[in-house]
Amino acid sequence: EFLFARTMIGVFKNIEYMCNRTSSKTWGKEAWKKIVVCIVSDGRAKINPRTRAVLAGLGVYQDGIAKQQVNGKDVTAHIYEYTTQVGLELKGTQGSLKPRSATPVQLLFCLKEKNQKKINSHRWFFQAFGRVLDPNICVLFDAGTKPGKDSIYQLWKAFDLEPMCGGACGEIKVMLDHGKKLYNPLIAT
């Protein structure tokens, strides 16, 4: 749940950043209505119970209602949606919920019944949700990747400024504790 929480905290901060761009023609106070955070989890038996608890705390998951079969047919995935105003914070290596009053976040959670690997999850995202949501851009994160406070905005801006742009990627930096660079002379330089 630590990796998931770290990513979601970064995503939530990006949504707040876009809502605070009050002079923008595209973003501003109601920007959260233009953003849907889709979470795809690969396998109901594989998902970390603490991550499930975090998702339940955010309001986008209900434990105990998912079934393997309905009317004798195998279930492929379970889909939950919710607009949350609950935030997340990290305390050491654990994610925890915190009350949040400012920016709502629209969440869509797909819990695949079977573990079918990452590419299948991407296919779910693009073929199932992409068709329904019809987004202008999509930004993909693996759990554990922490976007900077305006990273998603900067990626959106690249597409907005160049409509023929088919793809973009952000910069990835290693996250180190304060002072850890000094232990490795290659990183310290």
From Swiss-Prot:
Pfam families in the cross-refs: Chitin_synth_1 (PF01644)
E.C. code: 2.4.1.16
The record, for InterPro entries, names:
Chitin_synth (IPR004835), Chitin_synth_fun (IPR004834)
Superkingdom, natural source? Eukaryota
The record's subcellular location field reads:
Cell membrane
Which UniProt keywords are given for this protein, alphabetically ordered? Cell membrane, Cell wall biogenesis/degradation, Glycosyltransferase, Membrane, Transferase, Transmembrane
What's its catalytic activity? [(1->4)-N-acetyl-beta-D-glucosaminyl](n) + UDP-N-acetyl-alpha-D-glucosamine = [(1->4)-N-acetyl-beta-D-glucosaminyl](n+1) + UDP + H(+)
Q: Which GO terms describe its biological process?
A: cell wall organization; chitin biosynthetic process
Q: Name one GO molecular function term.
A: chitin synthase activity
Report membrane topology.
Multi-pass membrane protein
Main subcellular location of this protein, as a coarse class: membrane
GO CC, sorted alphabetically, is: cell septum; plasma membrane
Its annotated function is as follows: Polymerizes chitin, a structural polymer of the cell wall and septum, by transferring the sugar moiety of UDP-GlcNAc to the non-reducing end of the growing chitin polymer.
Annotated family: Belongs to the chitin synthase family. Class I subfamily.
Q: Which PANTHER family did the record assign? A: CHITIN SYNTHASE, CHITIN SYNTHASE 1
Q: Can you name this protein? A: Chitin synthase 1
What organism is this sequence from?
Answer: Exophiala jeanselmei
Which gene produces this protein? CHS1
